């Protein structure tokens, strides 16, 4: 609420210091600084820059038209948005489609269920096919998991889409009939096309962002970016903390795409999208704290993960699912990826 909006930076600082100070006392200020900088430079930086880039570019594309919210239209739009999430991110797809979905269903009385399914499909499970789609997969990609590895989830995604969209269709059909029976009727716009896009040139910048992420996994194997020892050329930050030149290239490409998107797009499009910086600011502040405070768990699991008694991947599946229901899925993913690695899964 209002308290969080006003004091969230202080809350993040408090919880971060709750880890940093005892850790510094036990292991030394230098080790504490290296630990914090390591996660911020090599995890948080690429994570937040990618979200920022997709947030900016998606905010410069608008969808207009005379589509009327009906069961069939809602199912089709949410289905398209689900697949779109894996390529422009769940945040980007949600930004792009939430306003059109709300607008085309504005004439209806019974419509709350539509946004629930929107969140299920577009804002969550839709990002499961690529590291662009969802931050946990991006963290896995940065740790060596191939970019297209998660494409194998497509049959699972498709099955869940069919189930959810079928449920949505019948729920929405029932609600739609109630609205019509109660006298609610949509406004018909005769001189307006069914659907109209503005700012479509921003697709170029989305492609640049996707290319930047893919290149961050390809360039480290190119000899040009390696030193004499065969290691990726890096920029020293502090102690043992280094920023790989390939990560810097990724960050620069994404920020350049975001900058060019703003420079080449009419500001009226952002006004139509009610574009503000509030959402990305909140994510940026919150995840600094998340990345820092999950370091103790990652360290413990690296050294003692095999002692947890987990002997099969299915056990991790159920535990991660349970934890992700009330924790963010990114730290949950990282914790159990580390656990699985320590156990040789």
Tell me the role of every PLM-derived stretch.
Residues 20-40, 55-69, 83-96, 296-304, ...:
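Transmembrane alpha-helix boundary signature
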Residues 2-10, 31-45, 147-156, 193-197, ...:
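Interfacial loop-to-helix junctions that mark the boundaries of transmembrane helices
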Residues 1-3, 54-69, 102-105, 170-174, ...:
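C-terminal ends of transmembrane helices
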Residues 13-25, 51-59, 81, 158-170, ...:
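Hydrophobic core segments of alpha-helical transmembrane domains in multi-pass membrane transport
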Residues 109-110, 129-130, 139, 148-197:
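Juxtamembrane and boundary regions of transmembrane helices in multi-pass small-molecule transporters
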Residues 55-65, 80-93, 122-130, 157-168, ...:
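Helix-loop-helix module between adjacent transmembrane segments
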Residues 21-24, 85, 95-110, 114-116, ...:
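Membrane-interfacial helix-loop connectors
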Residues 206-343:
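Transmembrane helical segments that form the transport core of multi-pass membrane transport proteins
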């Amino acid at each position: 609420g209002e308290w969080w909006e006003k004091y969230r930076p202080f809350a993040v600082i408090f919880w971060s210091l709750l880890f940093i100070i005892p850790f510094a006392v036990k292991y030394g200020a230098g080790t504490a600084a290296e630990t914090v900088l390591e996660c911020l430079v090599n995890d948080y930086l690429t994570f937040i820059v990618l979200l920022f880039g997709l947030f900016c570019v998606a905010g410069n594309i608008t969808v207009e038209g005379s589509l009327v919210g009906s069961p069939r239209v809602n199912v089709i739009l949410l289905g398209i948005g689900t697949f779109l999430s894996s390529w422009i991110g769940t945040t980007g797809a949600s930004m792009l489609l939430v306003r059109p979905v709300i607008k085309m269903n504005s004439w209806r009385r019974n419509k709350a269920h539509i946004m629930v399914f929107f969140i299920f499909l577009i804002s969550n499970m839709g990002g499961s096919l690529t590291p662009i789609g969802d931050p946990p997969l991006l963290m896995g990609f940065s740790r060596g998991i191939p970019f297209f590895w998660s494409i194998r989830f497509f049959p699972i995604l498709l099955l869940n889409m069919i189930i959810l969209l079928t449920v949505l269709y019948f729920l929405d059909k029932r609600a739609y009939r109630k609205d019509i029976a109660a006298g609610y009727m949509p406004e018909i716009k005769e001189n307006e096309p069914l659907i109209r896009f503005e700012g479509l040139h921003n697709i170029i910048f989305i492609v640049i962002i996707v290319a930047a992420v893919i290149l961050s996994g390809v360039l480290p194997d190119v000899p040009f970016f390696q030193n004499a020892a065969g290691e990726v050329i890096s920029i020293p930050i502090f102690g043992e903390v280094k920023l790989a030149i390939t990560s810097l290239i990724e960050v620069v490409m994404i920020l350049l795409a975001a900058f060019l998107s703003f420079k080449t797009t009419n500001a009226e499009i952002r006004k139509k999208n009610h574009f503000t910086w509030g959402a990305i600011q909140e994510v940026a502040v919150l995840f600094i704290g998340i990345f820092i405070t999950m370091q103790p768990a990652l360290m413990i699991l690296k050294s003692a993960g095999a002692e947890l008694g987990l002997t099969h991947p299915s056990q991790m599946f159920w535990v991660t699912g349970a934890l992700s229901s009330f924790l963010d899925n990114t730290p949950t993913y990282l914790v159990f990826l580390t656990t699985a690695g320590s156990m040789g899964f």
